[in-house]
Amino acid sequence: LITLWNVYSFYATYASVDGFDPIKNPIDQNNLSILDKWIIAKTHLLIKYADQSLDTYRVDRFMKSFEVYLDELSNWYIRRNRRRFWKSEDDEDKKSAYATLFHVLENVIKIIAPVLPFVSEVIYQNLIRNSDKNSSESVHLCDYPIAIEEHINKNLIKNVDALKKTIELGRSARSISDFRIRQPLSKALFAVEDDKISKFIVENQDIILDELNVKSIERIS
């Protein structure tokens, strides 16, 4: 609950400061970053799983997956994208970050409404009703979200998850070797069997360089 509320508060605070209007600035697929597409894919995958779980009365299963999803949304997507929200320039990249987070939150509160009726209603009123007066009066009067298959890019999910795993292993290696993150290192070595995943990691190495505080990465066999 705290994580969900913190994500909502983060969006509400900065969107209000910047005067972002989600109705006038819908998602533009051409301006989305890799992580935007990834969290959208994860969101629609969650919608699909939520629908299946609730149909079979397995709320417990859904909540476990929801906790994992919230952790990724908060501790990966938002943490990695803070600079996009904080920067002074009101450019397309910043608008895409806001539009993505609004899309995610709008779907998340509708997904979770049957399980967390009061929290989802409060967020809905502040987030959706304040933005669109033509929207339903309550989250509980909204249609349940439908997963859009074309948004569930499984290859992208696989690639970003591999990138995250590489960073996690890098942090673990630093901890074992007693090298703090604040101490820059010249190179990080990584090994992966899949050439496509390796290519993705190299193409997005800036994330690894920043997360692990290294100057370069190199694949080893």
Predicted regions and their residues:
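Feature 926 captures the class I aminoacyl-tRNA synthetase adenylation module centered on the KMSKS loop
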Residues: 1-221
